[in-house]
């Protein structure tokens, strides 16, 4: 059938359409039936399309002989009036189905239908049939208007062509863009699959505070708020890490949390000020076991949700089936920068010269560890297309990770990169309270030196470590970026229902 969705209109015409619809609503109010709320839905379009998909089996005669009747509701997405009979399409959360409407059956309801608009929400009851073109249809015996739509939907051919408008008016985007709906359905399935995977392995899901007295758990600038009753400044959490590790101290040996973090930083195709993370901790695991876990949960989630481990993301074909590469950070830097020697990697003066040569801007306070990271981010990160664990980060940029037993100045840490984007971060946790206190103190000095992303000193966390924390491995996976990977989305805003936007003027 040909859908009759209004074409794009200039503002004046749109206003006239809205006025026309408001007049129709006024007439409904006069009849006392503006927004009825007594209809109970029993069937969904997608379920019917799946059950009766075989047109050879479910012929019009077979459908009529089945005696099957349905009771459903949805948004009117198309209508074609042809005198005594009409066709329409309604859309619910599961899909669309066609309606076949007859004036001699519906009576006054058919007359009313002629005045309804695309976008209205309607209820229908009736049997099933199939048109000459083979399309499954509901042969309506009853029809009602449930909600009057006052604003016209975008043109079906162009949809919401303005990307910013899609983000601002996600409610419209979800109505008219099936691909957008599918992304968010997959997002829900991804999170559900990860929860099931962890629950099956004796991990306990927990909830930790969203407002912190002391911001910690990541090097990031926090959002600040104020508790009026206590006259106390609080911080939206940048990470749940320190609270989750307190739970490990308390004997909850496998814990995880899937929740929001907040970082007062820039907005880009990869970053949103609030974002979702999976963070977990497992006692008696090293960063090697946590890398194994990371690889397996991502691979199994892809297989569960997509039915495959092969995905396309931002122009790259990614295969999650083979073992993920594991590559030391200093080795990766030297591979991509032959001018940098092994000795240079821990030599601040040498790295400063390399940064100058590479035109990498750095701060005077950076030691060799931070300089090495800057060179990695500028010259290596974007080249990591297939899944790659970058391991053994410098202590300077890993304030919560355990120091390496064999490599002074390095830690037992990893980050997972896919197509040049960081998806996960993990390490063997630092459980030496004296070492942790010294690291916190170094962070405080960095903050005093102007680094507004450096951590605060958390005395209570040090006290918790003094009770003793078992050797522990930890992991954080960016859920938003994982959803980007598994849905092929190129912007984080495409996988957030309501991404951060500047307020409209």
UniProtKB/Swiss-Prot annotation:
Belongs to the class-II aminoacyl-tRNA synthetase family. This is Lysine--tRNA ligase. It comes from the Bacteria. Mg(2+) 1 binds at residues 415, 422. Mg(2+) 2 binds at residue 422. Keywords: Aminoacyl-tRNA synthetase, ATP-binding, Cytoplasm, Ligase, Magnesium, Metal-binding, Nucleotide-binding, Protein biosynthesis. It catalyses: tRNA(Lys) + L-lysine + ATP = L-lysyl-tRNA(Lys) + AMP + diphosphate. InterPro entries: Aa-tRNA-synt_II, aa-tRNA-synth_II, aa-tRNA-synth_II/BPL/LPL, Lys-tRNA-ligase_II, Lys-tRNA-ligase_II_N, Lys-tRNA-synth_II_C, NA-bd_OB-fold, NA-bd_OB_tRNA. The keyword Cytoplasm applies. It comes from Xanthomonas oryzae pv. oryzae (strain PXO99A).
């Amino acid at each position: 059938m040909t859908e009759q969705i209004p074409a794009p209109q200039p503002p004046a015409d749109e206003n006239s359409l809205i006025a026309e619809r408001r007049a129709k609503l006024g007439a409904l109010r006069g009849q006392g039936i503006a927004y009825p709320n007594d209809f109970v839905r029993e069937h969904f379009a997608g379920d019917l399309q799946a059950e009766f998909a075989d047109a050879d089996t479910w012929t019009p005669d077979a459908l009529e002989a089945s005696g099957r009747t349905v009771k459903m509701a949805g948004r009117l997405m198309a209508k074609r009036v042809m005198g005594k009979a009409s066709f329409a399409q309604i859309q619910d959360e599961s899909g669309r189905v066609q309606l076949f409407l007859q004036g001699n059956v519906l009576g006054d309801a058919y007359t009313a239908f002629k005045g309804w608009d695309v976008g209205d929400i309607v209820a229908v009851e009736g049997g099933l049939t199939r048109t000459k073109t083979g399309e499954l249809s509901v042969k309506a015996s009853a029809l009602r208007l449930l909600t009057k739509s006052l604003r016209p939907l975008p043109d079906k051919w162009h949809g919401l062509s303005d990307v910013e408008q899609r983000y601002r008016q996600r409610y419209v985007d979800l109505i008219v863009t099936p691909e957008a709906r599918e992304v968010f359905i997959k997002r829900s399935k991804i999170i559900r699959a990860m929860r099931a995977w962890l629950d099956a392995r004796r991990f306990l899901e927990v909830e930790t505070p969203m407002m912190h007295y002391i911001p910690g758990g990541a090097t990031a600038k926090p959002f600040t708020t104020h508790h009026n009753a206590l006259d106390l400044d609080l911080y939206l959490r940048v990470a749940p890490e320190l609270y989750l590790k307190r739970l490990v101290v308390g004997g909850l040996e496998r814990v995880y949390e899937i929740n929001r973090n907040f970082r007062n930083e820039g907005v880009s195709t990869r970053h949103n000020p609030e974002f979702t993370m999976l963070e977990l901790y497992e006692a008696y695991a090293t960063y090697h076991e946590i890398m194994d876990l990371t690889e397996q949960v991502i691979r199994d989630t892809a297989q569960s949700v997509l039915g495959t481990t092969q995905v396309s993301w931002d122009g790259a074909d990614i295969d999650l089936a083979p073992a993920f590469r594991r590559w030391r950070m200093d080795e990766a830097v030297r591979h991509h920068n032959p001018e940098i020697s092994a000795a240079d990697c821990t030599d601040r003066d040498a790295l400063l010269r390399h940064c100058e040569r590479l035109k990498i801007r750095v701060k005077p306070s950076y030691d060799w560890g931070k300089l090495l990271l800057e060179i990695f981010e500028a010259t290596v990160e974007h080249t990591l297309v297939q899944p790659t664990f970058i391991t053994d980060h410098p202590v300077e940029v890993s304030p919560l990770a355990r120091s390496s037993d064999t490599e002074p100045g390095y830690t037992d840490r990893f980050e997972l990169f896919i197509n040049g984007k960081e998806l996960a971060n993990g390490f063997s946790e630092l459980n030496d309270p004296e070492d942790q206190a010294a690291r916190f103190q170094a962070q405080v000095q960095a903050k005093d030196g102007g680094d507004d992303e450096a951590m605060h000193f958390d005395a209570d966390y040090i006290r918790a470590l003094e009770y003793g924390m078992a050797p522990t491995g930890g992991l954080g996976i960016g859920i938003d970026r994982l959803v980007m990977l598994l849905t092929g989305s190129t912007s984080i805003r495409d996988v957030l229902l309501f991404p951060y936007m500047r307020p409209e003027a």
